């Protein structure tokens, strides 16, 4: 398995393309100049395209991915109704979902043969919308509205239209600020990192039409931490054994182990990382974690090891200015 790492740096308007070697080292293969401040990125389900959101002219760009080395070639673009904060797709590669924090909305862009064509639906009134996350069964879109302490739930029609589910939302504790999410591989649990109080909620997905409840909330931060909490990103290993979340103020990654059924998290430790880690990701083998320092302008690679999933730094690399997003593609 070959793996390629893509790093989005909006301040220098670049995507750095790296080969992830089997020993955890990175080899730079391409630097792409992007026509705008590139932030969120996601790979299409068939691994043929990289979709990126850019500003200040709000668009989604599609880059064709070379199957041999992961190199990028521009393919298409489509306008967006708001500034892109987060980008994702459904599992069939039919739609791109874009959350917009500033617009307080989530939009759906239709894909045709993998290329973005047009916006088919927009839902507004989602103050501080920070991500859009489709469940593994491709039936429910979870959309955190950070400023409202709620996660809105939508069904997605065959034409890409969003309809409020029943229940239409789940709520966090006041002041939590739900931000990013991941799902357990067993499809029974979701994990949401809360930006404003730096906590992680475990949501049990008993039934896509109801009976959804928060079964655990864990504080990410060390007991002696007294500064402003500012959590950012969350990812789980492919085997579902280890979960990671980062805080930008403390510049640390919190390490959790996950119970076999996915219902219980145990905090195992902390890893100091690059300054102001806005984004990170885990590779497809579950062996390496790559974190981006928005203020250090570097990325760091960590090896994941042991039953606890603790991290050991393997190396760090200069990238563009203000790196914010990390995507890993296997090909």
From Swiss-Prot:
The modification N6-acetyllysine is found at residue 287. Signal peptide: none annotated. One of its GO terms (molecular function) is 6-phosphogluconolactonase activity. Pathway: Carbohydrate degradation; pentose phosphate pathway; D-ribulose 5-phosphate from D-glucose 6-phosphate (oxidative stage): step 2/3. It catalyses: 6-phospho-D-glucono-1,5-lactone + H2O = 6-phospho-D-gluconate + H(+). GO terms for cellular component: cytosol. GO terms for biological process: glucose metabolic process; pentose-phosphate shunt, oxidative branch. InterPro entries: 6-phosphogluconolactonase_YbhE (IPR022528), Cycloisomerase_2 (IPR050282), Lactonase_7-beta_prop (IPR019405), N2O_reductase_N (IPR011045), WD40/YVTN_repeat-like_dom_sf (IPR015943). It comes from the Bacteria. Pfam families: Lactonase (PF10282). Keywords: Acetylation, Carbohydrate metabolism, Glucose metabolism, Hydrolase. Gene3D superfamilies: YVTN repeat-like/Quinoprotein amine dehydrogenase. Its EC number is 3.1.1.31. Catalyzes the hydrolysis of 6-phosphogluconolactone to 6-phosphogluconate. Belongs to the cycloisomerase 2 family. This is 6-phosphogluconolactonase. It comes from Escherichia fergusonii (strain ATCC 35469 / DSM 13698 / CCUG 18766 / IAM 14443 / JCM 21226 / LMG 7866 / NBRC 102419 / NCTC 12128 / CDC 0568-73).
């Amino acid at each position: 398995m070959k793996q390629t790492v893509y790093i989005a740096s909006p301040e220098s308007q670049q995507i750095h393309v790296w080969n992830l070697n089997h020993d955890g080292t990175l080899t730079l293969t391409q630097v792409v100049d992007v026509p705008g401040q590139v932030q969120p990125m996601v790979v299409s389900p068939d691994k043929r395209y990289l979709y990126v959101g850019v500003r200040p002219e709000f668009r989604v760009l599609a880059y064709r991915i070379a199957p041999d080395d992961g190199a990028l070639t521009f393919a298409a673009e489509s306008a967006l109704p708001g500034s892109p904060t987060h980008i994702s797709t459904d599992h069939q590669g039919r739609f791109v979902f874009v959350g917009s924090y500033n617009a307080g909305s989530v939009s759906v862009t239709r894909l045709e043969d993998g290329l973005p064509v047009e916006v088919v639906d927009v839902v507004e009134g989602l103050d501080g919308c920070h991500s859009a996350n489709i469940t593994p069964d491709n039936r429910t879109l979870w959309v955190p509205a950070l400023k409202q302490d709620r996660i809105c739930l939508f069904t997605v029609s065959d034409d890409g239209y969003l309809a409020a589910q029943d229940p239409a939302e789940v709520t966090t504790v006041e002041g939590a600020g739900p931000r990013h999410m991941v799902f357990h591989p067993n499809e029974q649990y979701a994990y949401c990192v809360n930006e404003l109080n730096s906590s992680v909620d475990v949501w049990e997905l008993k039934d896509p039409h109801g009976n959804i409840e928060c079964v655990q909330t864990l504080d990410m931060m060390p007991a002696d931490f007294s500064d402003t909490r500012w959590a950012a990103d969350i990812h789980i290993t492919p085997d579902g054994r280890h979960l990671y979340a980062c805080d930008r103020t403390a510049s640390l990654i919190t390490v959790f182990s996950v119970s076999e059924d996915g219902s219980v998290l145990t905090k195992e430790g902390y890893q100091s990382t690059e300054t102001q880690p806005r984004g990170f990701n885990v590779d497809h083998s579950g062996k390496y974690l790559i974190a981006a320092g928005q203020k250090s302008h570097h990325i760091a690679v960590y090896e994941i090891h042991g039953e606890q999933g603790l991290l050991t730094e393997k190396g760090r690399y200069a990238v563009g200015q203000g790196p914010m997003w990390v995507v890993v593609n296997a090909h």
